[in-house]
Amino acid sequence: MKIQSPFGPKIGIIKIPKKIISKINKEVDIILNNKSKLKKSDYSEKLVGEVKQEIEISRTFINKFLSKFLKENIKKFIKKSLNKNLNTFKVKNFWVVRQFKNEYNPIHYHSGSLSG
C-alpha cells in the first residue's frame, strides 16, 4: 500500500485483486437481471449523485467476499498513515455506481471515519 497526501487528507493506494472485482461485477449482474432484487437494491434515492443506477450490495455479500480484504487494508492504512492500530471495523454501506453519459456526482461528504 502506498500512502499519498496530495491535498490534505491521506489517501491509501492499493490494487484490488481481479478476483474481488469479478465477484462484485457478477453480483451486480445478478441484481441487474432480477427486477425484484434491483428494486430492493436501488440506492439512488439515498445518494447525492445525478445517476440512474446506484446499487447497494448486500450485507451477506460484504461479509462473505469483501470484509476480510477491506479490514486488512484499512488496518494497514491506519498503521501507515497514523501509526495506530485498528480497534474496530464495520462496513456501514457498500454500493456500486453505474455512471453513464451526462450523469455526474457532485462534490459531497461521506459520513464515518473512512470512505472510499
Task: Describe the residue ranges of each PLM region.
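A short coil-to-beta-strand element that immediately follows conserved catalytic motifs
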Residues: 83-94
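Non-heme Fe(II)/2-oxoglutarate
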Residues: 1-83, 104
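Catalytic core of non-heme Fe(II) oxygenases with the double-stranded beta-helix
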Residues: 93-116
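A generic structural micro-feature
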Residues: 6, 88, 108-112
